[in-house]
């Protein structure tokens, strides 16, 4: 039994609230336990210079954390004058994950800009961001279809993400901050609903991990992500 009462293979309480911000084409509040992220999807009728005239669209992402989303205040990256390496890595991961399930040709020469803003962090902010951003993206693209801008929804399949780690020798799904801080191994899995991987990130903090342990973490992640797909579908059906 974990500190929050969960079993080793259990997700935290997951909630996805759609239409959370009225101005964005797509906007959700996604909650993985005490981790809360606002994800918005904004449509622009233009593409980056490297795509102009090529008849294809683009999906990209930005990620940030509210200064007091963590236990102690962190200054805004804008105030420091540059984006940190962690932020750059996470927003590239979010963008890659969403492009993997978007038909960019069907999207046409327009862009969808995803903004993921962490308002409370308790571990797993990048995985929550990907899971919530997918729902915001679908809502934004549905709106384009309803307006007659697009003939079909340019979504090929769903995408979601979850963390898995080894804490005190045990494989745990969807780590909170305390567990993540104590983890001997930390992995993030991003998968599509056809059971294909977009990205797998894994790091041993102390002892290297075995193939058997990695396989165990993969199995736990796949089971967890399948549950996330069900939660996404339920949210989109409301």
Curated annotation (Swiss-Prot):
PROSITE patterns: RIBONUCLEASE_PH. One of its GO terms (molecular function) is tRNA binding. Homohexameric ring arranged as a trimer of dimers. Keywords: Nucleotidyltransferase, RNA-binding, rRNA processing, Transferase, tRNA processing, tRNA-binding. Phosphate binds at residues 86, 124-126. Belongs to the RNase PH family. It catalyses: tRNA(n+1) + phosphate = tRNA(n) + a ribonucleoside 5'-diphosphate. This is Ribonuclease PH. The keyword Lyase does not apply. It comes from Geobacter metallireducens (strain ATCC 53774 / DSM 7210 / GS-15). GO terms for biological process: rRNA catabolic process; rRNA processing; tRNA processing.
